[in-house]
Amino acid sequence: MSQALPLVTRQGDRIAIVSGLRTPFARQATAFHGIPAVDLGKMVVGEMLARSEISPDVIEQLVFGQVVQMPEAPNVAREIVLGTGMSVHTDAYSVSRACATSFQAVANVAESLMTGTIRAGIAGGADSSSVLPIGVSKKLARVLVDVNKARTMGLRLKLFSQLRLRDLAPVPPAVAEYSTGLRMGDTAEQMAKTYGITREQQDALAHRSHQRAALAWSEGKLGDEVMTVYIPPFREPLSEDNNIRGTSTLADYAKLRPAFDRKHGTVTAANSTPLTDGAAAVILMTESRAKELGLVPLGYLRSYAFTAIDVWQDMLLGPAWSTPLALERAGLTLSDLTLIDMHEAFAAQTLANLQLLGSERFARDVLGRAHATGEVDESKFNVLGGSIAYGHPFAATGARMITQTLHELRRRGGGFGLVTACAAGGLGAAMVLEAE
């Protein structure tokens, strides 16, 4: 039974995506070394508004995300408003849904449009793996708080005497689950073993991703959606992603050792997405507001779905869970799609999700559905490459995927596209897009 949920305003307007832009994505500690995520966010939003020629006063809300948050700027969205010349009266708040953060930002703006509280808004995300909130040990943190409360020098010295040398070591943010302690790569290894995914299959997918991304750049398909960034000392601009290995061979991938399960593993640095810096954003409006402003939308948001599963085993199955729900809400099936873009956190995770989308047993026994979502047609899948090649600034990836998919749909004469991602915490996200 169809459970389509049309995403329209009270007046029947569709949710239009009129513009999208991102910075080039740069590997950790390379081109964007020393540039915080908030500045990357300001760059992309300021440039997007300038290119669109939309008056900043038109934008009534900005929802932005940052996964690795900096204590000095916890509401990155508001800092972007204040730092880009937008009206100080523009509502702005920040969200976080791990790797699906900009999916959430888009959904929040869409919901504001549907309720009628705004007619235009910006959604996006930015992250820096090069500018990190380096912390201190729990013992040192407690001593510092107590020292601040101590009234005498003697008491302060007594508190400091409790510390050992190891307590003074800096503590970087962990790329691991808070509740389990498992690293994302540990989960990818679980999935490779559970679903029988070989090292050769993972390397082949990673190689495909890089080859297709390199081809997309060489054919000029990404130039309109990626800005040029001038970074200190302003000698050389950055215009393209710097992680793509267009000249690599499968033999190159085979040389790398496993990165997580060193003895029996198959997940390597080459078949995983790297730590990355970057930002991406989109402008959303009601369809009637876009017409008033004389804007031709890139496309429309047809549906979205978020899901959650247990975190202890194979938790990166978000696409397999959220895709059938998003399709159902769009009133579509997998065969109706022109393009399918899945976030490649790891090749093992991507291949596991593809396997389960076509599994009747998974659909019946796990999802409680009568039939599998469907086998994914390779000719529709990640046609321009994916996150393994482009990189993955956590909060920016969703907005990159949305913009990239809409542009490619338009090049193909329109149709429906699916963008979907897994996320830490056992979360999943999927959105169905439409272009004319």
From Swiss-Prot:
The keyword Iron-sulfur does not apply. Its EC number is 2.3.1.16. It is found in: Cytoplasm. It catalyses: an acyl-CoA + acetyl-CoA = a 3-oxoacyl-CoA + CoA. One of its GO terms (cellular component) is cytosol. GO terms for biological process: fatty acid beta-oxidation. It is an enzyme of class 2 (transferase). CDD domains: thiolase. GO terms for molecular function: acetyl-CoA C-acyltransferase activity. PROSITE patterns: THIOLASE_1, THIOLASE_2, THIOLASE_3. The active site is at 99 (acyl-thioester intermediate), 392 (proton acceptor), 422 (proton acceptor). Pathway: Lipid metabolism; fatty acid beta-oxidation. It comes from the Bacteria. Keywords: Acyltransferase, Cytoplasm, Fatty acid metabolism, Lipid degradation, Lipid metabolism, Transferase. InterPro entries: Ac-CoA_C-AcTrfase_FadI, Thiolase, Thiolase-like, Thiolase_acyl_enz_int_AS, Thiolase_AS, Thiolase_C, Thiolase_CS, Thiolase_N. Catalyzes the final step of fatty acid oxidation in which acetyl-CoA is released and the CoA ester of a fatty acid two carbons shorter is formed. Belongs to the thiolase-like superfamily. Thiolase family. Heterotetramer of two alpha chains (FadJ) and two beta chains (FadI). PANTHER family: ACETYL-COA ACETYLTRANSFERASE, CYTOSOLIC, ACETYL-COA C-ACYLTRANSFERASE. This is 3-ketoacyl-CoA thiolase. It comes from Enterobacter sp. (strain 638).
